[in-house]
Amino acid sequence: MGIRFIYGRAGTGKTYFCLREIKEKINDGNSHPLILLVPEQFTFEAEKYLLETVEKDRKMRAQVLSFKTLANRVFTEVGGLTRQHVNSCGRSMVIYKIMEDLKENLKVYYKASRQQGFIKKISEVITEFKRFEVTPEKLMDTAESIQKEGLREKLRELSLIYGKFDELLHQKYIDEEDALTLLAEKLEYSEQFKGAEFWIDGFTGFTPKQYKVLEKLLKKAARVSVTLTMDTSKDSIDNTDLFYTTKKTEDKLLKICYENNISYEKPVDLNEGVPKRFEKNEEMAFLEKHLFSYPYKIYSKDTKNISLFKAVNVYSEVEETAREIIRLVRDENLRYSDIVVTARDLKRYHKLIKTIFSHYGIPHFIDLKLDIKNNPIIVYITSLFEIYLKNWSYESVFRHLKTGFTNLNKEDISFLENYVLANGIKGGKWKEEWKYSFRNRLDKLFDDQDEKEALEKVNTIKNGISEPLNKFYKDFSNANTVREACEILYNFLVERDIPQRIENLIREFKENKEFEIANQYSQIWDIVVDVLDQMVEVMGEEKINIDLFSKILDIGFEAYQIGSIPPALDEVLVTSVDRMKSHNAKALFVIGANDGIFPASSFEEGILTDEDRQILTSYEVELDRDTKAKVFEEQFLVYTALTSTSKFLRISYPIADHEGRSLRPSIIISRFKRIFPQITQFSNVIEMDTDEENLHRVSSPDPTFNEMIKSFKEWDIKDKINSLWLDVYNWYSNKEVWRKRIEKVLEGFNYSNQVRVIPSAKIKRLYKDEINFSVSRLEKYAACPFAYFVQYGLKAKERKIYSFDPPDLGIFMHNVLNEVSKALEKEDKTWEDLDREYCDEVVNIVVDNMLKGVSEHILKSSPRYEYLSKRLTRVLSNAVWVISEHIKRSSFIPSGHEVAFGENQMYPPIKIILSNGEEINLIGRIDRVDVFEKGEESYIRIIDYKSGNKELKLEDVFYGLELQLLIYLDAILESADKENTDIKPAGIFYFRIDDPIVKADKDITDEELQKEILKKLRLDGLVLKDAEIIKEMDKSINGTSYIIPASINKDGTIGKKTKGATKEQFELLRKHVKNMIKDLAEQMINGNISITPYRKGKETACKYCPYSSVCKFETNFEGNKYMFIKEQKEEEIWNMLQKEVNKDGDKVD
């Protein structure tokens, strides 16, 4: 027995040396076993290399083993497999259950145990304790000695959890760490490795338990050779040295040999001369030797094999990597399998790599294990319990249904979802028969379908979901043990054909050549079964409720990750830096070389902080290295990664991340620039239009096609193009498969994002020959004809959600104010009679009655909405008080509320005769009409209630965006003209319903507060420019009015702050509005549905438009232009109105 070290820096051929020796031993005819011991993650690669090197080994003496497979071999021979193996899933489940049982004793950790990922951290620290042979008793003893209270409590609780874990495990189970302890014990009785020769390769260091196994192997084996990535042995080195960790490993192995009287053979030194890997690459040899040299050594020659790339963002970084891979394979005779792409943080890149490499046709394998929690099958199972635990919430139900593993098709799910969302269905409502009207909540979405049939359909779908689930929940609640609960869940999944559905999906994925997804799905069912098996194993006979079962099930799934085996021989390997080993790479791409990422500058501390570890070390409790040591070890990781290629090295870094946030280059970049002053540096931050750059953009057919189209677009703008792209165009044109695609794309160059005029006959059928139009619809058409067409022609509607939206708020407020006016009439009161107390009382009564009248009123559906109801009551009470104050201070009195004009209404509709002789009717409802009688003359003002800020602007009237108030006014005046009644306009106003916040620098009286409220809620609109009328409208006016937008000077004339119009100007506005209505109606009926939204400053019709995804309006599209509305002075608008009315003459009938 003896030990031999094989020294060699990166690339010196240590693995090759081991394989060559194994081959020689086989050829010499030696009969003893020849074992290559490597880390678990490298066994596949090592077996491949062994097969390639050995070629013939009929007696199968040469084997590749990891510590795990070594343990299995020994246990098979001498026993040790009788105890049930518990994997990381079972460990996590046991730990969670233990923490539930110990919750009364866990002040520090119990609450944290509910957090996702915390159980994994506890499992990791217990694993660390086991690896470093720290027992629960030692933890408790140390805790008693420690002065720091926080750490003392931590250790006490960890000791309790760890102790209970060990107690449960030793009854009949064994985990991976205990397997190493058992292996060390059983090796003594094993005969199969007696006289064997071991080559241990690929390790940087070992855990204490692995050292114990190695101690036993050293006693058994004829010889143990250990490769060490380092310089030739030195007596001592600093902890900042590149090879410090490897040196520590050497020292520990020497100590074991010394203590056990094991001979030390002459080491093999492979560090002489140029490393084997870099024999033909002077630059890489220099890099390997001087990467971390201090002071810097400079390579003064041209650098051709090492390059840097600065990318504008992560997408372009990966795309450039793909192009360079294509070039290497095409021009440098490399195979895809010669190429490795690596990143320190692969999770940041793997989706992009998958997308872009697939687009470029690059076969690749991503060596990354993925969490399974978002796999549809796992979601189907976890949401099964979530539905019950969250009382049939919308989110949990439809998370379950949308997995694709129910019997519902997408149309049924969508149909059901619309109904559930519109009616706020959750909880116990899923057990009832649904009778909520489709028409009421979904705005007549089912005009062509009988209401009864729709309800029958939605209830059938609902029952198909709820009945089997409720049966499952009932069966589950009757389960007496975890074993029975697992059986019920398993049977439920089998009854729903989940295993068969998975098989069908796998087959479909393979047929579509989606092998990676097929591979993932092929593992999922086994994982589900294994999780249930582990639950039965570790707590099978225990009683458990559904809540705890669900949590433990989630913990079990969290412990699993899905990995893949490379399905092809010739493909690019994409791996993370910390999983890299020599892959005989000829080309290496290091991506994401940014500051703090490569090398990593920080690590999560875990359960025990660095400070905790330092304190424990002082109490002789040795654990794994702290985060500071890990930072020092990063340079070794960087070294091994950068020196793993023999021919070509490209290091790239983006200057911005996925979200556009700036990133700094890694310190490695500046180090490379200093070592290699002649290094080639590329960048796409500024695109260069050179022949070389254009040629570089030619790679695979798909991406090159996109580059060609991009060049053609630039040609259209710059009026020049590189002739290369004309040659590329000819290549595609001569290929049948590409010709049609080219034609389609080139057609798109002339694309105009506009719509054709719809023939009048079709538009009439679409609008169903409607002749009645509301004012709001006309304003909608004026704002954007296309949005109007989509809403009223195509009947497209936003999905109705059970919520209290602004339109609902407006309707509610209008209804309350209307009911208040009815209550006043019933009690024979006038608005002048109201005081603040009565306003509060009457509004409370009205709101209560409205809520009682509708059993399912949304304002009673939750505490949040009940609070909103109280707030609205306060706002409306304030509005009623302000209205009463307005009326008290005015000679104008309300003559009507909710005054309708239309067929069979108080006032007839406004009739407009179009150019073709057709007639349309304008209909509507006026919130309030106030009247002032002056002799035989009557003056009216129109009041429209608004729940938000609304300001009347003349330019909006001119362009048709604000027609409402003037049409309301015209409906009254036109009717009066026909009846020869002398009624004159006094004003048109918006009244804002609000309870404003009043800010004051000092204490103010109630009277001052009321004035401030009135000022904030002043009417907005146009008042008749008649001083007498203004004074009648605000009898208390003194200067600027508190209630109307007007002011009176001291001499009795109208002030400048007055927002008004003369009698002639009101007439002008009426004529203009009628002309505008006629124009809009004719455009509408003539089929104009152009995409022309208005724009006024920063405000556009598109801002809150729900149809932007339909029109795809973009100003860079030909034909897409705004209808600009310029803010102008009043005088300019009046002149424009005058010219427009004079031009049209007697246009309005």
UniProtKB/Swiss-Prot annotation:
**What is the similarity comment for this entry?**
Belongs to the helicase family. AddB/RexB type 1 subfamily.
Q: Which residues form the signal peptide?
A: none
Q: Which UniProt keywords apply?
A: 4Fe-4S, ATP-binding, DNA damage, DNA repair, DNA-binding, Exonuclease, Helicase, Hydrolase, Iron, Iron-sulfur, Metal-binding, Nuclease, Nucleotide-binding
What's noted on cofactor binding?
Answer: Binds 1 [4Fe-4S] cluster.
One of this protein's GO BP terms? double-strand break repair via homologous recombination
Molecular function per GO: 4 iron, 4 sulfur cluster binding; 5'-3' exonuclease activity; ATP binding; double-stranded DNA binding; helicase activity; metal ion binding
Mind telling me which InterPro entries this protein's record contains? ADDB_N (IPR049035), DNA_helicase_suAddB (IPR014140), P-loop_NTPase (IPR027417), PDDEXK-like_dom_sf (IPR011604), PDDEXK_AddAB-type (IPR038726)
**Lineage, uppermost ranks:** Bacteria, Bacillati, Bacillota, Clostridia, Thermoanaerobacterales
Query: Could you share any additional remarks the record makes about this protein?
Result: Despite having conserved helicase domains, this subunit does not have helicase activity.
| Protein name as catalogued | ATP-dependent helicase/deoxyribonuclease subunit B
List of residues binding ATP = 8-15
Native species? Thermoanaerobacter pseudethanolicus (strain ATCC 33223 / 39E)
Q: What does this protein do?
A: The heterodimer acts as both an ATP-dependent DNA helicase and an ATP-dependent, dual-direction single-stranded exonuclease. Recognizes the chi site generating a DNA molecule suitable for the initiation of homologous recombination. The AddB subunit has 5' -> 3' nuclease activity but not helicase activity.
* Pfam families according to UniProt: ADDB_N, PDDEXK_1
SUPFAM superfamilies under this entry?
P-loop containing nucleoside triphosphate hydrolases
Names of required cofactors: Mg(2+); [4Fe-4S] cluster
Q: Which NCBIfam families does this entry report, sorted A to Z?
A: addB_Gpos (TIGR02773)
